[in-house]
């Protein structure tokens, strides 16, 4: 079952995936529109030139009013066609100059009142004027050709730059899509890890379980045995006190060392009695009257082989206590919380309880620690 964090990540990934898809579609649409616009402009230019210049023609089968998308023009052939047209124009110009240069010059350049006496085309004056015309013509053509070459180079550079930027944008979109795919893979792996952890927790909680009725019966027997042991312990304490008092009176001077040892033993017995009383109060308040309002615990389960026991507290908490090897003190505490969807370890609660103890857990009575846990979780 997915957690809130996984659900949030999943929603963010979906949103990011939609954003990348929209950006990619927009980029591709802009590129298609730009290419279509360029082809449309070239097509319109060719059509316009074909109408204004008889040297350029378009197939008669093409309807000028039809959609541009149906008019097929290969831009790669334009340079070759332009070169062919330029060669053809040059031939026409040479022919025209050879046949009409003299007539054109005489009619529009030389005044009728100041005629030149030219005997032939080899006349020095004619040759000089012809050279001047050719020089001016070549200069003008060179300037125009330079401008055309410069414009062509500028167009080529901008086209290459635009193509490079388009490639970079496409690579960025592809990289973003690949990153989103990787995020989806990692999210699936995270869900598998969460699922495996939940299964491990459930398996741990279900090992070595005993029935509730057997547990209550066993607990009651242990409680009865503890009551008997406590009575015997109190009797032994009274006898020990009498014996110590007797020895103090009879061997006051000679047995001081033995008395100190007896006092130490008496102190240990007193601590044991106190712990047994805590145990009796704990069992009486939590297990002897199952289901009563005083009961704060339920589902007590004991695992003798692993030296673990667990119980439920406040309905949604399950507490697992690991005892030391000798079974007389606590080694560690784990608290699991059921939020209605899954069972997960609540490390914050565990840390909060452990921080209350300045010394190691093994130095505190077991049932004192359990009571503290119950009070914290109730």
From Swiss-Prot:
Residues 1-32, 130-172, 224-277 form a coiled coil. InterPro entries: Kre28. Keywords: Centromere, Chromosome, Coiled coil, Kinetochore, Nucleus. GO terms for cellular component: kinetochore; Knl1/Spc105 complex; nucleus. One of its GO terms (biological process) is regulation of meiosis I spindle assembly checkpoint. It is found in: Nucleus; Chromosome, Centromere, Kinetochore. Belongs to the KRE28 family. Acts as a component of the outer kinetochore KNL1 complex that facilitates microtubule-kinetochore interactions and the spindle assembly checkpoint. Kinetochores, consisting of a centromere-associated inner segment and a microtubule-contacting outer segment, play a crucial role in chromosome segregation by mediating the physical connection between centromeric DNA and spindle microtubules. This is Outer kinetochore KNL1 complex subunit KRE28.
């Amino acid at each position: 079952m997915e957690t809130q964090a996984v659900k949030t990540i999943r929603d963010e990934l979906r949103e990011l995936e939609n954003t990348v898809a929209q950006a990619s579609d927009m980029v591709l649409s802009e590129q298609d529109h730009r290419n279509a616009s360029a082809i449309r402009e070239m097509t319109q230019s060719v059509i316009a030139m074909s109408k204004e210049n008889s040297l350029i023609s378009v197939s008669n089968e093409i309807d000028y009013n039809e959609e541009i998308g149906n008019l097929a023009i290969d831009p790669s052939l334009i340079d070759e066609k332009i070169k062919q047209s330029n060669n053809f124009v040059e031939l026409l110009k040479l022919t025209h100059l050879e046949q009409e240069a003299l007539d054109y010059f005489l009619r529009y350049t030389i005044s009728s009142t100041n005629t030149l006496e030219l005997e032939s085309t080899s006349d020095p004056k004619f040759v000089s004027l012809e050279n001047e015309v050719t020089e001016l013509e070549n200069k003008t053509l060179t300037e125009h050709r330079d401008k055309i070459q410069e414009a062509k180079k500028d167009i080529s550079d901008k086209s290459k730059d635009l193509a490079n930027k388009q490639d970079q944008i496409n690579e960025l979109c592809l990289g973003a899509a690949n990153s989103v795919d990787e995020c989806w893979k990692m999210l699936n792996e995270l869900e598998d890890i969460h699922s495996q952890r939940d299964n491990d927790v459930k398996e741990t909680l279900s090992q070595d379980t005993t029935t509730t009725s057997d547990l209550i019966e066993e607990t009651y027997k242990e409680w009865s045995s503890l009551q008997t042991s406590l009575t015997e312990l109190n009797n032994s304490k009274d006898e020990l006190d009498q014996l110590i008092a007797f020895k103090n009176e009879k061997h006051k001077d000679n047995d001081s060392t033995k008395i100190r040892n007896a006092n130490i033993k008496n102190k240990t017995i007193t601590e044991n009695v106190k712990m047994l009383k805590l145990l009796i109060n704990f069992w009486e308040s939590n297990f002897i009257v199952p289901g009563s309002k005083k009961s704060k615990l339920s589902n007590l389960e004991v695992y003798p082989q692993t030296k673990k026991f667990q119980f439920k507290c406040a309905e949604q908490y399950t507490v697992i206590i690991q005892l030391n090897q000798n079974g007389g003190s606590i080694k560690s505490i784990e608290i699991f919380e059921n939020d209605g969807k899954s069972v997960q370890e609540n490390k914050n609660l565990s840390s909060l309880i452990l921080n209350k103890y300045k010394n190691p857990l093994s130095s505190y009575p077991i049932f004192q620690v359990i009571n503290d846990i119950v009070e914290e979780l109730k």
